[in-house]
A protein has these predicted regions:
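A short, well-structured beta->alpha microelement
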Residues: 21-40
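Adenine-nucleotide phosphate-binding core of ATP-dependent small-molecule kinases
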Residues: 153-187, 194
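Conserved phosphate-binding catalytic cores of ATP/NTP-utilizing and phosphoryl-transfer enzymes
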Residues: 1-2, 70-101, 217-226
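Short glycine-rich phosphate-binding loop at a beta-alpha junction
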Residues: 41-52, 62, 185-194
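Conserved phosphate-binding/catalytic loops in two-lobed NTP-binding clefts
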Residues: 60-72, 203-221
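Glycine-rich phosphate-binding loop plus the immediately following alpha-helix
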Residues: 81-95, 122-167, 223
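Gly/Thr-rich phosphate-binding beta-strand-loop-beta motif of the actin/hexokinase/Hsp70
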Residues: 1-25, 98-121, 137
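Short, charged/polar "capping" segments at the starts of alpha-helices
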Residues: 36-37, 52-58, 196-199
């Protein structure tokens, strides 16, 4: 770990930070219009981006791009966040059975990325994420409003409109993951802002799920330090 080196991932809706607090890192998020967090020096900031860049003086030479990530069969058009997540999953996951890795990044979108035990990208899927689905219903319908709280009901069929929206969206995301995940052949790793919410629901039915919310940020640190 190098003194005063911090990390930033510019997401689609938020800024994701890893602040160097030796010997560990502090992971947190801010809105794009917020000021730079205290103790973050932009000159020593390693960054990557999948969203619109904020009005910050980010140094081009400090940028990590998809082309910088050494993975087999990695297309240049893949998001750098997906590439970094794959890189870190390969590093941290114990995989003696040589299963394939399925990474579910639960953010603005739910992106699924599958790779072999040897680190070769197979491909993936992308669908609207938890909040994106809720907000799209509010935007494109007359009478639906996005819930302010995200307590997923246990029942399958609800009377309350907000509960019905929450259950429908959570089921849609779990359905995408369940249809793509074969526990006999795959290891499922969940990351991103909504990974603990969706992952906890999946874990009620399947035990062999790894939830690592900061997988991508840890991947940035790993890439830089190696």
């Amino acid at each position: 770990m190098i003194d005063d080196i911090n990390f930033l991932l510019v997401g689609n809706s938020r800024l994701h930070w890893a602040e160097n607090l030796q010997p560990k890192y502090k992971f947190f998020h801010t809105q794009k219009n917020n000021n730079v967090p205290q103790n973050i020096n932009l000159n020593n900031l390693i960054w990557a981006s999948v969203g619109k860049l904020p009005d910050l003086s980010l140094k081009k030479e400090n940028r990590i791009s998809t082309q910088d990530i050494k993975l087999k069969n990695l297309p240049n058009h893949f998001g750098v966040d997906r590439a970094l997540g794959c890189l870190e999953a390969l590093r941290i996951i114990e995989n003696p059975s040589r299963k394939e890795l399925l990474i579910a990044d639960c953010g603005t979108t739910l992106s699924l990325t599958k790779l072999t035990a040897q680190g070769s990208i197979i491909g993936g899927q992308i669908t609207p994420g938890f909040l994106t689905q809720l907000r799209s219903m509010e935007k494109y319908t007359k009478n639906l409003e996005a819930p302010k709280k995200y307590d997923i009901p246990l029942q399958d069929f609800l009377i309350n409109t907000e509960d019905s929206m929450l259950k429908g969206v959570s089921n849609s995301l779990m359905g995408v993951i369940n249809l793509s995940f074969n526990p006999t052949k795959d290891i499922l790793i969940m990351c991103g802002g909504d990974s603990e919410l969706i992952g906890s629901l999946l874990k009620q039915k399947k035990e062999e799920i790894i939830i690592a919310p900061n997988l991508v940020m840890q991947g940035m640190i790993t890439h830089f330090n190696h």
